[in-house]
Amino acid sequence: MARDEIVDDVDVNMEEDDAEAEQRLINEEYKIWKKNSPFLYDMMLSTALEWPTLTTQWFPDVKNPKDKSHTVHRLLLGTHTAEGKPNYLQIAEVEIPKMVELNPRDYDEERGEIGGYGSKASSGEPLCIRFKITQKIDHPGEVNKARYQPQNPDIIATLAVDGRVLIFDRTKHSITPSGTPSPQLELIGHKEEGFGLNWNPHEEGCLVTGSEDKTVLLWDLKTYEGTSKQLKYSRKYTHHSHIVNDVQHHPLVKSWIGTVSDDLTLQIIDVRRPETDKAAIVARNGHSDAINALAFNPRVETIIATASADKTIGIWDMRNMKSKVHTLEGHQDAVTSLEWHPTESAILGSGSYDRRLLFWDISRVGDEQTQDDAEDGPPELLFMHGGHTNHLADFSWNRNDPWLVCSAAEDNLLQIWKVANSIVSKEPADMSTPELDDPKPKQSSH
């Protein structure tokens, strides 16, 4: 046997050993998280999907059935199946138990708390979340991203792996798949696949997309004339020099669109300007690796967050984009998803390849800490969700139930959960929390 073949075998064996050691560590961390979870969550559901989803979003509606102890919410999901298997755009119904008035008779002596994850209401019913897929719509290839139109949530846009942007009207499809993908409209313009997709919250029928072909495209469904199922973009931007990873309309300023790229820049387009080869604002030198996502603060119009492969999150103030206002450090791998809390303007969620979803409270930046607290992370690190054992793919805040989150990992695991009120409430909890086991990395709490 040649010497280089022996070296190759050694390298392979070392890689296998490293992978096994990493998996053992992941499994151990998961066991610790599972043991601690009754103290960390008011409710939790982990469900194994048939296939992983790369995308998740709560629909804006909620039903409140009479004489029922739950509310009914809906989720938008996709699939990422194995080679040769069909893919679907999926809609799920989720029954969320109503939070009951705490009753001293529900006190759990073993855990030393009232109510909480896994407890029962005074009626004796367990506080359990129920999940079921209610509609499957055929989709060509995996769903890179799916988002509903805010003005009409039955209209859904998806990013396909061939670069097409597909528009589906959910009401025009049966609840079971037909076997043939049949979107209402195909938006043609990108030459490569992408993950950047965002509807215009100010104008119905308009959306923006970003792609690995380095372009940002604007679309206006109102220009569709019905002669074919295809529609061309209304405007093409070429201001980035590398892959465009994420795009977002500003939620408060109609003419602004934010874009981020592997070229390490955050850029702001002003659609009122005629030029399409440069942005109105360019923020450089904020990150040392690709910028994967951005999020405009929905309540403070000048604040933007960026997520990077350099493991950090940048906080920017649009009044001075020469440098970041602050850097959030706590993830151990690339940060890939960002979303601000829908009602708490200082709360930001971030998902990462490190399998963690972190909650940050920007209002705590600079707060004094004890040495013990500092070991758990910076003062603005509010909470660490450690329930996933694979890369975070996407997550979504529920707009009808504060602090209710859906998170999806690149394995089949989908989790629907609500962090314990004692951790995120402004006032300290009345009852002390028992001492938790010490996971690595540490769970962050008050």
From Swiss-Prot:
WD repeats by residue range: 138-178, 189-229, 231-270, 286-326, 330-370, 387-427
Identify the Pfam families for this entry: CAF1C_H4-bd, WD40
Positions with biased composition (Basic and acidic residues): 437-446
Q: Which UniProt keyword terms apply here? A: Chromatin regulator, Cytoplasm, Nucleus, Repeat, WD repeat
Which Gene Ontology cellular component terms are annotated?
A: cytoplasm; nucleus; Rpd3L complex; Rpd3L-Expanded complex
Q: Annotated Gene Ontology MF terms? A: histone binding
Where it mainly occurs, coarsely classed, is cytoplasm
This protein's assembly is summarised as: Component of the HAT-B complex composed of at least hat-1 and hat-2. The HAT-B complex binds to histone H4 tail.
* Family of the protein in this entry: Belongs to the WD repeat RBAP46/RBAP48/MSI1 family.
Name of this chain's protein: Histone acetyltransferase type B subunit 2
